[in-house]
């Protein structure tokens, strides 16, 4: 469970903590809290720990976009993300047409604030941003979110989250073609 209404101050604090440790705005729809995601990750975490995986949970205000970006070059074996996903076929750039929603995204999704005015990320992680990460060494990414396997189709294949994570170096993906309720 992520807090999509996380305050800007909390987001800035979390962004600074992540930095020390290692956009879309086309409508006014706000992202609602997904209570099932908290149950999902707190159920999976002990299972992974019992299988000798190191587990880091980032929920509520800690679930900022920078947490995923901080995994770049970390050779994390498995990444499981339970949140909102989106696909907007009207985007002019295929890699901007889909993404994942992180804590605090409602502050930017529905407001007139510009990304350039912020010293931290906006909580909306696009496929384009993901494609610039180095996730080599990541065996599996699980995206428990709506429509994560959708993308724009061109002569070069599908442009979306699947291409972004593969370009970033992820070996395998578990994604959905439908809305997750």
Feature locations, PLM:
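Catalytic cores of enzymes
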Residues: 1-181
């Amino acid at each position: 469970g992520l807090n999509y209404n996380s305050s800007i101050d909390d987001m800035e604090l979390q962004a600074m903590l992540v930095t020390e440790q290692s956009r879309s705005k086309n409508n006014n729809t706000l992202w609602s809290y997904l209570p099932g995601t908290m149950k999902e990750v707190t159920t999976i975490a002990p299972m992974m720990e019992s299988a000798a995986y190191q587990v880091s949970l980032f929920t509520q205000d800690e679930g900022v976009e920078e947490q995923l970006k901080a995994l770049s070059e970390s050779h994390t074996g498995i990444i499981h993300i339970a949140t909102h996903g989106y696909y907007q076929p009207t985007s002019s750039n295929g890699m901007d047409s889909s993404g994942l929603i992180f804590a605090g995204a409602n502050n930017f999704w529905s407001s007139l604030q510009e990304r350039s005015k912020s010293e931290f990320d906006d909580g909306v992680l696009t496929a384009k941003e993901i494609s610039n990460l180095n996730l080599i060494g990541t065996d599996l990414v699980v995206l428990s979110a709506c429509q994560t396997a959708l993308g724009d189709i061109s002569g070069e294949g599908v442009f979306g989250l699947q291409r972004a994570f593969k370009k970033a170096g992820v070996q395998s993906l578990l994604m959905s073609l439908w809305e997750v309720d």
